[in-house]
Amino acid sequence: MIILAVGIGFGFFVALLSLLAIKAGFGSGYNSLVSVSSFDKRITLATFILLAGPSEDIFFIGFVQNTLTPSLGWGAIIIYLLLFIAYHYANVISGAETKKEFLGTLPIRLMASLLLSLSFYLTRSLLYGLIVHNLIDTLSYVALLYSARQKPTQISSQ
C-alpha cells in the first residue's frame, strides 16, 4: 500500500512538472492532442487510460521484466528501464518532442519507470503500476489541456 501512496504522490508531482514544462514551451509537438474537438479529446483520454499505460506495463513489466527476473534478478529492472526509455524515444522520432525535451524529461521518466518496475518486483502485481502509470499519463494530459485553455491563441495558431 505504501507503494501506491508514493506512486500517487509522484503522479501529482509529475503532472505539476508537466504543467510547468508546457508553460515554459516544452512539448509543442503535443499541441495536436489539444487542438481537436471535445470528442477527440475524450477519445485521447480514454486511450491513455485504457491502452497506453496498460499495454506498456503488460508488455515491458508483465512480460519482459517478469521473464528476465528469474535469471537476472534486479538486472531485469535495468533491462526494463533501458527498453522503456528506448521505446519512448519514439516521441523524438515522431516529432512530438525534440531531443532536448526528451533529455529534459529523462530523469522523470527514469524515476517513474523505476517506481513502476519496483512496485511489480516487490509485490508481483501489475495493479499498483497500472494505477500509477494511468495517473501520471492522465494528469499529464489534463495539464496539457489546462495549459491550452490558458493560451488558446498559441495552440490554434501552430
Which residue ranges define each predicted feature?
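Interfacial transmembrane-helix boundary/kink motif in multi-pass membrane proteins
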Residues: 1-17, 30-42, 75
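Membrane-water interface of transmembrane alpha-helices
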Residues: 12-27, 87-90
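Transmembrane helix-loop-helix hairpins at the membrane interface
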Residues: 38-158
